[in-house]
Regions:
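Short, Lys/Arg-enriched N-terminal segments with co-localized hydrophobic residues
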Residues: 13-42
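Structured C-terminal helix/loop/strand segments within mature extracytoplasmic catalytic/sensor domains
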Residues: 19, 40, 44-50, 54-59, ...
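Short, conserved catalytic-motif segment at the N-terminal edge
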Residues: 119-143, 163
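Active-site-proximal beta-strand/loop segments in catalytic clefts of secreted hydrolases
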Residues: 129-131, 181-186, 193-197, 224-228, ...
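Active-site SXXK
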Residues: 143-167, 181, 313
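Conserved catalytic neighborhood of penicillin-recognizing serine enzymes
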Residues: 164-209, 219
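Mid-domain, small-residue-enriched loop/turn segments at the edges of structured enzyme/sensor domains
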Residues: 194-255
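A conserved catalytic-loop motif detector
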Residues: 233-293
Length: 342
């Protein structure tokens, strides 16, 4: 369903009408005065050919109506495909509507991608951010199983408490656990760090991870169990936009809100699992990423960097019947996204 912002249309038309009045005043001494409670239109004519005015006024009024409608149409909502330029919660600054060329370009891409997502192999979410133009968009952005993508947020929480943790457990222990957790997706390392965050208590450690997510408005991300633990009572969840916004902060490095953004970036650059987003990209293309897998889940979140057009890309898929096909889908669509911008 599409919604029209009639307030925007009215104000656009008023601006057009004021400009029109100014033109008429200069050419014909035609005066229009507006008050808050009523509209008063006293007119003073000086050698005016009224037919001439009609020939000018009516087409201009029609043009104003068409222009205001076009303005409103350009601002319409896009349903589940949601491009935006900038984000008030991100390092990129304030909100901008989807009227820019960049967002139109992104909308075309999102439409293409949605048409290629599998319809018989699980549920899918996709996020794309043009890191140069600072525009982003998503398909089906909703809470889904995080698998090992929860480790991105464990990493964020650890670095936010880095000084305290290294003071208590030692820098070598914290750093080596971070490296193993991210580069080879070591579950034991993830559990060790979560325990560190809780002062030896895993429940409190998970609460610290969740507090980190809430404080940074990753509102659809939740750590409900330790890695390898049963998901009978709770599970780990995230969404593509939460992962994408964390990647944007990491990519920003010194301009980021995170003191250790460069350290996080370097860990992602050292990733050894390259079978999804990087798999079909040219050999010279650099990707910093983190994967996630369960029996019926295939996820990947990555930054394509040092390219003509750097990008952040996130794929989440769950309830899969064919995980191998899902890996190929992520690889193929990542290649399509890269080639679209580069």
């Amino acid at each position: 369903m599409q919604f029209i912002d009639y307030n925007s249309q009215v104000f656009f038309f008023i601006r057009f009408f004021v400009i029109l009045a100014s033109i008429l005043q200069k050419q014909y001494n035609f005066y229009i005065h507006l008050s808050i409670k009523q509209v008063v239109i006293p007119m003073h004519f000086k050698h005016i050919n009224t037919r001439h005015i009609q020939r000018i006024l009516l087409p201009l009024l029609a043009a104003g109506i068409l222009a205001s409608s076009a303005y409103c149409y350009a601002s319409e909502g896009q349903g589940m495909l949601s491009p935006s330029s900038g984000n008030s919660d991100s390092v990129f600054g304030g909100n901008t509507s989807s009227e820019s060329v960049t967002d139109e370009k992104l909308q075309v891409l999102l439409n293409q991608l949605q048409g290629q997502l599998p319809t018989g192999n699980g549920s899918w979410s996709v996020y794309v951010c043009d890191l140069f133009e600072k525009s982003e968009g998503s398909i089906n952005d909703q809470s889904m199983q995080a698998a090992s993508l929860i480790k991105l947020f464990i990493m964020g929480a650890v670095y936010e408490n880095y000084d305290q943790l290294t003071g208590t457990y030692g820098k070598d222990s914290v750093d080596s656990s971070l490296y193993s957790m991210i580069t080879v997706s070591d579950n034991d390392a993830a559990n060790t760090l979560t325990n560190y965050l809780g002062g030896g208590n895993s429940t409190e450690g998970m609460e610290t991870v969740n507090a980190f997510c809430q404080s940074h408005e990753y509102n659809n991300t939740h750590m409900g169990r330790m890695l390898l633990a049963s998901n009978e009572n709770d599970d780990n969840y995230t969404c593509v936009s939460d992962c994408g916004h964390l990647l944007k902060e990491i990519y920003a490095e010194e301009d980021s809100g995170y003191a250790h953004a460069t350290d996080m970036y370097n860990l992602l650059k050292a990733q050894t699992r390259r079978n999804k987003i990087p798999a079909q990209l040219p050999d010279n293309v650099k990707v910093a990423n983190k994967t996630g897998e369960l029996d019926n889940v295939e996820n990947d979140a990555g930054i394509i960097y040092d390219s003509e057009n750097d990008l952040a890309i996130v794929f989440l898929s769950q309830n899969l019947s064919d995980v191998s096909a899902a890996e190929n889908t992520i690889a193929a669509l990542s290649k399509e996204i890269y080639e679209y911008y580069n």
